[in-house]
Amino acid sequence: MTMITPVQAILASNQHFLDRQDVMESNVRSYPRKLPFAYAKAQGCWVTDVEGNEYLDFLAGAGTLALGHNHPILMQAIKDVLDSGLPLHTLDLTTPLKDAFSEELLSFFPKDKYILQFTGPSGADANEAAIKLAKTYTGRGNIIAFSGGFHGMTQGALALTGNLGAKNAVENLMPGVQFMPYPHEYRCPFGIGGEAGAKAVEQYFENFIEDVESGVVKPAAVILEAIQGEGGVVSAPISFLQKVREVTQKHGILMIVDEVQAGFCRSGRMFAFEHAGIEPDIIVMSKAVGGSLPLAVLAIRKEFDAWQPAGHTGTFRGNQLAMATGYASLKIMRDENLAQNAQERGEYLTNALRELSKEYPCIGNVRGRGLMMGIDIVDERQSKDATGAYPRDCELAAAIQKACFKNKLLLERGGRGGNVVRVLCAVNINQSECEEFIKRFKQSVVDALKVVRS
């Protein structure tokens, strides 16, 4: 049979494909502007472009590729489905594969407490479903979200998102969203900093909910990330997550935790909320849940399953290839204890980066959990604020990312103004690859400083 899919690399430059992309695709595209190359092949934590250049990938599909690129067991899972005759698309009809995937995913939650809801294929779809369910169950319309949070780009999910860049261009987003400050020990929203600042946010949240004159109607739900990713890799303190759980339970408010990016071993636990020992009412999952393919799922405490049949539907709920790769990924995560690997590799990277900050004080803060880390790039030549934080240096952070690309290291930035360099590699990364990251990142900092500050 003649191959009809143009997957073979042709003799052309990265710029050739970027120019064609510029002609054929909308101005909305983002990653090619900062990472200007065209994929030819990839394996594990390594990517090769059409010119033969090899890169160390610390982006991992924005967290989707928990096992890296083209893991052989996942590739075999895809082949097995293709050879089986199983339909690739089944709506919400069941199959033996879906049954096995569902059982495996539920095994990571407390026994007999949760059920699954398959939604559309993206995290935004799943967050929309979670909010709709909370409103259906409670009969209330308001939602509390947090500054710096990111929950997707659809109308409802965008209304829950803190970043104003995408929101300012769109009117009439979902009403009834009240934003609260998110604890940040380095850049405290109350200007206190450290543990005291985090405690102040806890007290503010509790008072806000319980104050009969706060001006906010009792919400249907509180939605948050246990680790804010796009917001600059900010980890919620354990006590804060516990306080939110305590207050929401006390007042009959659903607690929704968005684990789209932080979930599936990335934080050093299967789910980031597990660090606090809590049980959310709804857990939102996408990205890594599908083993690199599109899939999104809610885990819902059984007592909150208020849906009527067909109360929330979606065409792409039955992606059998994603369930195959998702099932295989879950087995590998458990069998190889990848949560522990993420914890150990994350500790190494954190310590190495903090040592690097002594030599290069533009690295103002290194934070995160496991292999979800943020490197806060600052202008240490300026005065610190009242909490001890230097001003953000967004220009230098952009230059570091650009230098990383030249040094064949792929990564992304986040946070206010994009001053936080993000570590989001595969959770099965090995020690030598982590050491190579430090080597390339250090050289990139040196190169960027020469460009921006010399």
From Swiss-Prot:
Q: Which residues form the signal peptide?
A: none
Pathway(s) where this gene product acts: Amine and polyamine biosynthesis; 1,3-diaminopropane biosynthesis; 1,3-diaminopropane from L-aspartate 4-semialdehyde: step 1/2
Determine if Transferase is one of this entry's keywords.
Answer: yes
GO biological process terms on file: biosynthetic process
**EC annotation?**
2.6.1.76
Cofactor(s), names only, from the UniProt record? pyridoxal 5'-phosphate
Give the UniProt keywords, A-Z.
Aminotransferase, Pyridoxal phosphate, Transferase
The N6-(pyridoxal phosphate)lysine modification is found at K287
One Pfam family from the record? Aminotran_3
Q: Which domain of life is it from?
A: Bacteria
Q: Do you know which PROSITE patterns this protein is assigned to?
A: AA_TRANSFER_CLASS_3 (PS00600)
Q: Which GO terms describe its molecular function?
A: diaminobutyrate-2-oxoglutarate transaminase activity; pyridoxal phosphate binding; transaminase activity
| Similarity section | Belongs to the class-III pyridoxal-phosphate-dependent aminotransferase family.
- Protein name, entry field: Diaminobutyrate--2-oxoglutarate aminotransferase
Q: What are the leading ranks of the lineage?
A: Bacteria, Pseudomonadati, Pseudomonadota, Gammaproteobacteria, Pasteurellales
